[in-house]
Regions:
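Phosphate-binding and adjacent anionic-ligand microenvironments
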Residues: 1-127, 134-138, 145-151, 157-165
Length: 165
C-alpha cells in the first residue's frame, strides 16, 4: 500500500486519498506533526535533530546548468555522453553502480537519465530538463552531520562539473 511520496519542487502525496502533489497536503502533515509533538513538549526542530542523531544527516541538492540554443542542446548531449564514460568516482566517493535509463530499466520507460550510486549511501543523478534548456544534477549525500554532508556534496559537484569541459 502507498504511504508517502514527494518530488523536487516540494509537492507531497500522503496516503492514497490525495491525487495531486501540492503544498496543501504537506502543510496539513506539518500541522499534524506540530500538534502531535507539542503535546509531548517537543518542537519540530528538536525532533529533526533527534532523527539526525539517530540516522545521520541526509543532504539533497539540485544544481541546474543552462545551455541556450541549438549549440547548447548539442553541448548537453555531449555532456550526457561524457557522463556515460568510465567514471570511477565523484568527490572521492567510489561509483558502485551506474544506472542508465536510456533503454528503459526495471520496467521503467526509456529516459535520458543517469544515476550513479556511490559508496557511503550517496548518489548523483544527471538528466536534461524536459521543459527548459538545462542540465540538472541531483545529489544525495548521507553523512554523520550537516557539515560533513556539505563538504562531500561540494566535492561531488566539483567533480561533476569537470565533465562539462
Amino acid at each position: 500500500s502507498y504511504v508517502f511520496g514527494f518530488e523536487e519542487s516540494y509537492g507531497y502525496l500522503t496516503g492514497s486519498y490525495v491525487r495531486d502533489k501540492d503544498g496543501v497536503d504537506g502543510a496539513y502533515m506539518i500541522c499534524e506533526m506540530f500538534s502531535y509533538y507539542a503535546t509531548k513538549g517537543i518542537s519540530l526542530l528538536d525532533k529533526l535533530d533527534e532523527l539526525y542523531k539517530t540516522y545521520g544527516y541526509c543532504l539533497n541538492t539540485l544544481h541546474s546548468y543552462e545551455f541556450d540554443g541549438s549549440a547548447g542542446f548539442a553541448k548537453m548531449q555531449s555532456i550526457m555522453q561524457a557522463f556515460r564514460g568510465n567514471i570511477k568516482a565523484f568527490g572521492g566517493k567510489k561509483v558502485v553502480k551506474l544506472l542508465d535509463y536510456a533503454y528503459g530499466l526495471d520496467g521503467l520507460p526509456k529516459s535520458e537519465v543517469l544515476k550513479f550510486l556511490l559508496e557511503d549511501n550517496c548518489s548523483i543523478v544527471v538528466r536534461p530538463s524536459g521543459t527548459e534548456p538545462k542540465l540538472k544534477i541531483y545529489i544525495s549525500v548521507s553523512a554523520e552531520n550537516r557539515e560533513a554532508a556539505e563538504k562531500v556534496e561540494c566535492e561531488i559537484v566539483k567533480d561533476a562539473e569537470k565533465w562539462f569541459a
